[in-house]
C-alpha cells in the first residue's frame, strides 16, 4: 500500500477500491458467506478505508448485487508473520449511500 500521513489507529479517508483491495475482499468472501449463511454471486469492492494497528484493518464496502451492499472489516497481520487474512467484522443490509465508518 502507498504510504500516507495519518495518526496510528486512525481511519484514512474513503477511497476507490483497487485491485489489491478486491483481492483482499475475495479472500475473506468464504468467511463472510459462512457467517451470514448467504452466497454472494456478485462481490465487488467499491470503496475502502484503512487503519494501521499491529497490522492493518481494511474497512471495505462491497456491492453484492442489486441495491445491496455489505461493509466488511478485514485484518491483515504484519507481513513478516505470514498469517491469512481474517474477517473481523461485517454489516449487512447496507446501501450505496451508507457511509463506511469504523464499527
Swiss-Prot record:
The family classification in the record reads:
Belongs to the cystatin family.
Chief subcellular location equals cytoplasm
Positions occupied by motif Secondary area of contact: 51-55
Protein role: This is an intracellular thiol proteinase inhibitor.
Instruction: Write one Pfam family the protein is assigned to.
Output: Cystatin
Q: Which InterPro entries match?
A: Cystatin_dom, Cystatin_sf, Prot_inh_cystat_CS, Prot_inh_stefin
Task: Give the matching Gene3D superfamilies.
Answer: 3.10.450.10
Can you cite an annotated GO cellular component?
cytosol
Cited PANTHER family: CYSTATIN FAMILY MEMBER, CYSTATIN-A
Keyword Acetylation tagged: no
Q: What is the protein's name according to its record?
A: Cystatin-A8
From the Swiss-Prot or TrEMBL record, what is one GO molecular function term? cysteine-type endopeptidase inhibitor activity
Query: Where is this gene product found?
Result: Cytoplasm
**UniProt-annotated site: Reactive site, residues:** 10
Q: Report which superkingdom the organism of origin falls in.
A: Eukaryota
Per UniProt, the keywords (alphabetical) are: Cytoplasm, Protease inhibitor, Thiol protease inhibitor
Start and end residues of each stretch annotated as Disordered = 1-20
